Curated annotation (Swiss-Prot):
Entry function: Probable beta-1,4-xylosyltransferase involved in xylan biosynthesis in cell walls.
The organism of origin for this protein: Oryza sativa subsp. japonica (Rice)
Name the record gives this protein: Probable beta-1,4-xylosyltransferase IRX9L
GO cellular component, as recorded: Golgi membrane
Residues annotated as glycosylated: 185, 258, 361, 411
Amino acid sequence: MSRRNAGAMQREGSVKDWEEFDPSPSPKLAYSQSYVAMRGLLTSVASLDLVLMSSSLKSAWAAISSHKHARSLERSRSKGMSLKRAMLQLLVCFMVGIFIGFTPPFSVDLPGKIASENGRLPFDGDAIDRRQMVERQGTKLEPFVAEAESEASSEPQVEEGPPVPAMLDDEADFVEASPIVHSVNDSGIVVRKHLIIITTTSVRPHQAYYLNRLAHVLKDVPPPLLWIVAEWPYQSRETAEILRSSGIMYRHLICNRNTTNIRKIVVCQKNNAIFHIKKHRLDGIVHFADEERAYSADLFEEMRKIRRFGTWPVAIHVGTKYRVVLEGPVCKGNQVTGWHTNQRRGVSRRFPIGFSGFAFNSTILWDPQRWNSPTLESIIVHSGGRGGLQESRFIEKLVEDESQMEGLGDNCTRVMVWNFELEPPQVNYPIGWLLQRNLDAVVPIT
């Protein structure tokens, strides 16, 4: 054996002996365990770092995503608000456009513009002179020429009175200064004077017949017309029903005076109607229409021609002799020159006509100074006087003489009112119908 082999054997033996008797672990084993432990530690640390990094990334991403979501919500909310604002502005602009589209163009000087464009409509403003309008329009304003001439004449000016009560607001107005019924060119607008018809009535057998007959005549008269019915001693249901069913604008008054004198009762009824006109200052033509008279509808159209006082003839049926007497004016044109009269001898009447033979302007009652009335006392009907003196005294308070009267009915040649004495003065039972005592009972009641 060589020295090299012996040395090798000696090293192996020494190594085996060292390894057999050395209590410490093998250095190769220790290195592998520490490496594994270190590697596990590093792995756990790396995994922990990854977990921490992933959680931080997740939280950061969540924060970023939540911020983005919040910003998107705010952005969507702002977009919604702006959209609503835009829609509201669009709606407002649309409504304003519709309002402007339906509003007709106008100017501040509206009356002057209308008067300049349409000569048929007169205005009494300071900027428009009536005479200049008539000269500029020529024949187009023929209906208003009479009005302008009457205003320039010496006749008293009829100013605008207080407003008519609410019960008359729905009625058509009329031109006071114009004495005729006229139409405004071809527009179809007809201006008529207001008629105020006064009728006295009382409960009696033929009351319904007379009122219905007069109501049918008045219903055929074109409006405006007011029917004032004064009743005594109370407002009966039958009369109220007749007035309601007539289709005419009416006033139902009463005279509750405690008397049995027929003349005083009629005077009370007429004065109550006059006081009603004075109180409300009704403007129109007044006529006392007796319910027992027979009227032609043409008479009421003739009344609208009256400026101050108008009169016409009345035919009176005298008793059972089948004779007719004419009572009323004698005219030359429309000027009253004399009278047809049936008055008795010894009775002198200044104006020999009855209440059914004249009509007058109502402004004489509540403003007589406009017409230079001959009397300053209150214009009422007095109960004194017989044989037509009552009517004559009432007319004397309205006019001075025949020059202030106007004759109607084709120069006072037409008869439009008839007075027929049809109703008996008193309705009684025939003789023998009224028993003074009761009959004796044939079968007594036990």
